[in-house]
From Swiss-Prot:
Residues 131-347 are annotated as: Domain III, AAA+ region. Transmembrane segments: none annotated. Pfam families: Bac_DnaA, Bac_DnaA_C, DnaA_N, Hda_lid. The gene is dnaA. Residues 348-467 are annotated as: Domain IV, binds dsDNA. It comes from Vibrio cholerae serotype O1 (strain ATCC 39315 / El Tor Inaba N16961). PROSITE patterns: DNAA. This is Chromosomal replication initiator protein DnaA. GO terms for cellular component: cytoplasm; plasma membrane.
Length: 467
């Protein structure tokens, strides 16, 4: 009964939850029904706490729906479902004994999955270098709605490298925290296991190492090195585009690492299938584990980032100043940090207190550029071009989905990227009421949670408008 009951719950949860959430949190759960108690086993404490906090009501509701009057008690445990005792071993024949006698010789011929790297080899200029930045850890990564899923996945991978989500593929625009998460995973893996061999690198470094190995006739050493790591963290995988020899070598490295249960984490500025110049067989493999989008931070996260960075610099940043900066600089974390560094430097040089007027003066060129780039008119033109419709359609009364959805997206973008009020936005979209704009913003926020396509479109448009 446990398998059928939990299977029914799983099927419904898969329909109700976004695909990425279901794959990350619910699918790994194992179930056992015993004495009218359904025990759900989570792979680790982090998953257990998350499921109990976020999905307990959903699970209880479905248990009541599918169990009728005999609703089982629900409990959670960390671990795996107990394994059923094996059947008694069959009687062995003489042929079985003869076959077993040859097994040790066969095993002796097998090579270990984790190969060793000969550090004394002079054939190739490759030595173990982790390149993991010790400054980038989970405890100084600012969590928000835009990166929550990516952070949770990274934490799970660091707790169970090679087992949870392999490969993990993080994608999103420049300066959103993907590289920070790569380093944080690397640091956490080494903290948990000081002997772990973790390597972080930009994809171009992989290409450089391969070229150098070919020049030095040391390609076998190159292969042994990259296939012996416990975790390979590669940034900006899109730079493999049109490098056929590098793609060929990485394809075989990828397969070897996965076969050996060694962790792979990749980042890119776009969704795997949208990376041009990369072979389909590689793009397909990029999606074998878990693919998570890292989106531009929302206002609250931008404020939290500024406050955290100011605290790191031992600088008091008034709340109203943090909100002033965060409302005007929206594209990425790197831009926020750069702006704050400029404000702090100006304050140190002049000895003046950090106020809104002071920030407006210190960042006047940057703020002027942002206000010039992102206007409602610019948003309308960009959205219309993206969806291959006319700006006049966005301003019209047409309600067909092919027009209504882009219009709602454009309104949501105007609220996110400009300082205009809801009535002003409504007026710019054909004289619509502010409640229409509010409904559009809420609808798009909901769809970004439920629809990968809408989430992707929204991220692409923000990236275009902020570039």
């Amino acid at each position: 009964m446990s398998s059928s009951l939990w299977l029914q719950c799983l099927q419904r949860l898969q329909e109700e939850l976004p695909a990425a959430e279901f794959s990350m949190w619910v699918r790994p759960l194992q179930a056992e029904l015993n004495d009218n108690t359904l025990t759900l086993f989570a792979p680790n404490r982090f998953v257990l706490d998350w499921v109990r906090d976020k999905y307990l009501n959903n699970i209880n509701r479905l248990l009541m729906e599918f169990s009728g009057n005999d609703v089982p008690n629900l409990r959670f445990e960390v671990g795996s479902r107990p394994v059923v005792a094996p059947k008694p071993a069959p009687v062995r024949t003489a042929a079985d004994v003869a076959a077993e006698s040859s097994a040790p010789a066969q095993l002796a011929q097998r090579k270990p999955i984790h190969k060793t790297w000969d550090d004394d080899s002079a054939a190739a200029d490759i030595t173990h270098r982790s390149n993991v930045n010790p400054k980038h850890k989970f405890n100084n990564f600012v969590e928000g709605k835009s990166n929550q899923l990516g952070l949770a996945a990274a934490r799970q991978v660091s707790d169970n490298p090679g087992a949870a989500y392999n490969p993990l593929f993080l994608y999103g625009g420049t300066g959103l925290g993907k590289t920070h998460l790569l380093h944080a995973v690397g640091n956490a893996i080494v903290d948990n296991n000081p002997n772990a061999k973790v390597v972080y690198m930009h994809s171009e470094r992989f290409v450089q190492d391969m070229v150098k190995a070919l020049q030095n006739n040391a390609i076998e050493e190159f292969k042994r090195y990259y296939r012996s790591v416990d975790a390979l963290l590669i940034d900006d995988i899109q730079f493999f585009a049109n490098k056929e020899r590098s793609q060929e070598e990485f394809f075989h490295t990828f397969n070897a690492l996965l076969e050996g249960n060694q962790q792979i984490i990749l980042t890119s500025d776009r969704y795997p299938k949208e990376i041009s110049g990369v072979e389909d067989r590689l793009k397909s493999r990029f999606g074998w584990g878990l693919t998570v989008a890292i989106e531009p931070p929302e206002l609250e996260t931008r404020v939290a980032i500024l406050m955290k960075k100011a605290e790191d610099h031992q600088i008091h940043l008034p709340d109203e100043v943090a909100f002033f900066i965060a409302k005007r600089l929206r594209s990425n974390v790197r831009e926020l940090e750069g702006a704050l560094n400029r404000v702090i430097a100006n304050a140190n040089f002049t000895g003046r207190p950090i106020t809104i007027d002071f920030v407006r003066e210190a960042l006047r060129d940057l703020l002027a550029l942002q206000e010039k780039l992102v206007t409602i008119d610019n948003i309308q033109k960009t959205v219309a071009e993206y969806y291959k419709i006319k700006v006049a359609d966005l301003l019209s009364k047409r309600r067909s989905r092919s027009v209504a959805r882009p219009r709602q997206l454009a309104m949501a973008l105007a609220k996110e990227l400009t300082n205009h009020s809801l009535p002003e936005i409504g007026d710019a979209f054909g004289g619509r009421d502010h409640t229409t704009v509010l409904h559009a913003c809420r609808k798009i926020e909901q769809l970004r949670e439920e629809s990968h396509d809408i989430k992707e479109d929204y991220s692409n448009l923000i990236r275009t408008l902020s570039s």
